[in-house]
Amino acid sequence: MGNSQSINKINFETVQNIINNNITFGKFMIINTLENSNQECLIKNTLSPEEEINTLNNYLKNDKNVNILIYGENCCDTKVIDKYNQLYKLGFSNIYIYIGGLFEWLLLQDIYGDDEFPTTTKIIDILKYKGKSNKFIK
């Protein structure tokens, strides 16, 4: 079976608690795996790509125990796993993935409102973040 790390997955309620600082185990750094050209709508408190680099470099030197939340475009976005592994190899250990991603968050925002599911901007076309359909399934 060998050595393999277990990926820490969290749901939308935990993300809400992180945003509202209702987590008992400290503050979180929130990052995403969306393309640089697709950063106009993010979950509240997400660092910009520039802030992410600077903040990660600072924590890399000073505190690898920082809590890091990663999310992607949707539940099929494998870039979150790549980012998780990259950070793990750098020595970070408190890494969590919000599997639902921005798509789930926006769907919940559409139903329950901006106060419960805040983003940096309002998006009308939620399906922009649904991902590509699987061509193998008919």
Outline where the language-model segments fall.
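Rhodanese-like catalytic fold shared by cysteine-dependent sulfurtransferases
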Residues: G2-Q16, N20, T24-F28, T33-L69, ...
